[in-house]
Amino acid sequence: MIPARRFLLSPFVGVTFIVVLVSLYFRSSFKSPQHQYQKRLFSAEELALYNGTDETLPILLGILGSVFDVTKGKFHYGSGGGYNHFAGRDASRAFVSGNFTGDGLTDSLQGLSSSEVKSIVDWRGFYSRTYTPVGKLVGRYYDSQGNPTKHLKGAEAKASRGAQLMEKQKTEEAKQSNCNSRWSQDEGGEVWCDVGVPRLVQRPLEIAITGSMSKRCACFEEDQLDQSGLEIYKDCEPLAKTCRV
């Protein structure tokens, strides 16, 4: 049996100790950028540094104040990429507006409908599932302590309301089947019903969902045609099953 003193002084123990130290050193030295930025609070000026122009830095993107590392999507988010306009900033509005220049690249959701705000919240969910969250952007949606602001809570509430209205509209419209439709450049469009006749009807929840009114084509039986709000297609016979549009 090797005496304790001889064991502690043996070359084998010394080499093992050095290997362990080196291992710990490299483990601490090569932490991923995602780990280094975890739970960090960014200012707008700081976030702008991670816009893909400096290849030594990760590429970060903000949406509703949540910041994600999108470096693995460098082809899209890096300099010259199709989505580079989102890098280094929170351009939440542009996810639904399609305005990728000037004032369009803003985190303000003012004037957007509940369905549009829901789409932005859904986009945030996509980034949460696909990329690594690395912190919060101090400003409109998070305060200097990293707590959600009234703007974030309001956006999430509006998105939730939009989801409820869309589900309600889907349920209501399922009660009256949609018309069949087709369109070609040569012949134009037409709508038809396998059962019943086509009528244009208002979508009553649409203004609350999208901010504007719209109509859809639905099929009605003859004994339902006395309902208010049913519109006959122009130049179409009242009981025709097919109408040109």
UniProtKB/Swiss-Prot annotation:
Q: What induces it?
A: By auxin.
For the region Steroid-binding, give the residue spans. 45-138
Mind naming one GO cellular-component term on file for this protein?
membrane
Q: Where is the Cytochrome b5 heme-binding domain?
A: 39-138
Q: How does it sit in the membrane?
A: Single-pass membrane protein
Q: Which InterPro entries match?
A: Cyt_B5-like_heme/steroid-bd, Cyt_B5-like_heme/steroid_sf, MAPR/NEUFC/NENF-like
The UniProt keyword set, sorted, is:
Lipid-binding, Membrane, Steroid-binding, Transmembrane, Transmembrane helix
Organism domain of life = Eukaryota
Q: Where are the transmembrane segments?
A: 6-26
Location in or out of the cell: Membrane
> From the UniProt record, which GO molecular function terms apply?
steroid binding
Q: What is its main location?
A: membrane
Instruction: Give the similarity note.
Output: Belongs to the cytochrome b5 family. MAPR subfamily.
Domain characteristics, as noted in the entry: The cytochrome b5 heme-binding domain lacks one of the conserved iron-binding His residues at position 100.
What protein name is recorded for this chain? Membrane-associated progesterone-binding protein 4
